[in-house]
Each structure stands twice: as C-alpha cells, then as structure tokens.
Amino acid sequence: MAIQPHHQASEMEIHKAVTFMHKKDFNAAVEVLKGFEKKDKGLMARAATNLSFIYFLEGDNNSAKKYAEMAHKYDRYNAKALVNLGNVQYANGEFEKAVETFQEAAEKDSDCVEAIFNLGLAYKGMENLDEAKRCFEKLQTIMPMNAEVIYNIANLHDQMGTPATDPFPARACCH
C-alpha cells in the first residue's frame, strides 16, 4: 500500500515542527503544529502532544493541559500525551491525579520510562516512599547506569533511613 502524498506532507510538517523544537524556536513549532487542528486525528494527536510539551516547557500549564487532553481524546493509547497531562497535574501539586495519569501512561506503553520516572516523583510528592522506590528500582533494571535513577533511589533510602545497596557492585575483570 502506497503512502498518500498528503500523509507524506503531514509527516514532513511534524518533522519540521520537531526540528524547530530542537532549535528552541517554539513559536515556529507552535505555528506549524497548530496547522494540524483540522487534519487527520492521528496526526492531530501527535501535533497536540508536541504542543502540550512546548506549552509545559514555557510554563503555560493551562494550554499544556488543553493540548494533552486533546491528544488523548484523539488517540486513547497516546502514553506521551498522558505523561504531559500528568506533568501538568504534578506541577499544580495534584499528586494523586498525577499518579493515576502516570499509571495509565505506563499501562498504555510499558516501555515509557518517562511515565515510570514521573510516577516515582509523584509518589515522592505524596510521601509514599515505598511506591516511589519501587518505581525507581524498576527503572534501574531498564536503565542500570542512569544517574537520575540512582540518585532518586539513594535519596529515597536516605529519606527512609535505610542503607542502600551498592548500585555499582564490584565486577571481576580479566585479560
């Protein structure tokens, strides 16, 4: 099955917007992404997810929430949209809502490390340190040398008053 020319053009526009985002030209990215508001639902979901991310980075939580909810409406399996929505909830101090949203994102995409990481942070915000530690330990199995994950595990052990196991156990070497 051949890819339709309008679909190729839309994909190119998405990539153009992402390039603007990487260059931190958020105004240009927003302008490109807003052009998707009347297009195909799948592409609109991707554009809305990116808009949500941009608005969150700019501190416009109301717009970030609006576009995250729009992206989720157009694509119910969009874990990244849920992560963006959870980020807004977390930033607003709505830790319980954020936990639910990050859990849903992790259920939609079990490989979404952002959902698991942010779920751990939301549990920390709720002072549910055992669940937070469980999230970061799960991440350590996926990303064993990630400094942020190791830091959060050590920080949680400090807060809980328990000694942490060495995240870098001695390894034998031979030539």
Residues of each region from the PLM?
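Short coil turns that delineate tetratricopeptide repeat
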Residues: H7, K41-G42, R76, S110, ...
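Canonical positions in the second alpha-helix
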Residues: F36, M70-A71, E104-A105, K138-L139, ...
